[in-house]
Regions:
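Active-site cofactor/cluster-binding pocket
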Residues: 1-167
Length: 167
């Protein structure tokens, strides 16, 4: 949906997943490049401008911040304080306004009725980075999901956007 939102703003985008292990429950890494000019490279992103951590239990098993720029953005799916997550020391190295935690799973349950945090995280990403307009995020969600599912996901994204802006 992030790449769809970027396309809707007239940008070029590329999104693709990377699966490490073939077993259920293994961490999945997804990449999205956004640029105002054509994107020709197709390899994984080794030095991201931003990371979105959907599952904070990965902090102690995977280096989710590897390669992140010194002025990069971090969005975490959690309602818990950074100290409780055990990552506050690393996050202190980044600009304070570039770091945010949003309880995206809880927002998804509230608005969609299921623990599907992707749309909420996209709303939070738009707020934290300013890379995408919320209107594009909303349109991408509604393009991907019809009816009540689209409405619920758009509402979760708006709630996350507003929570991230207020943080």
């Amino acid at each position: 949906m992030m790449s769809i939102a970027a396309f809707l703003e007239g940008m070029h985008a590329q999104a693709f997943p990377s699966f490490g292990s073939e077993r259920t429950g293994a961490p999945v890494v997804s990449y999205c490049r956004i640029d105002d000019k054509e994107i020709r490279m197709r390899e994984p992103i080794l030095d991201p401008d931003a990371v979105i951590i959907q599952d904070p239990t990965l902090f102690h098993s995977v280096d989710v911040f590897q390669g992140l720029h010194q002025d990069g953005f971090v969005l975490i799916n959690s309602a818990r304080p950074f100290e409780e997550l055990g990552i506050s020391e690393f996050l202190e190295t980044l600009p304070e306004s570039h770091v945010c935690a949003v309880g995206a799973t809880e927002l998804a349950i509230q608005h969609v009725g299921r623990p599907v945090p992707n749309a909420a995280l996209l709303g939070g990403f738009a707020a934290v980075t300013g890379q995408l307009k919320f209107e594009s995020v909303d349109a991408a969600i509604r393009k991907k999901f019809a009816g009540k599912i689209g409405e619920g996901n758009a509402a979760a994204a708006l709630a996350a956007f507003e929570a991230a802006k207020a943080a």
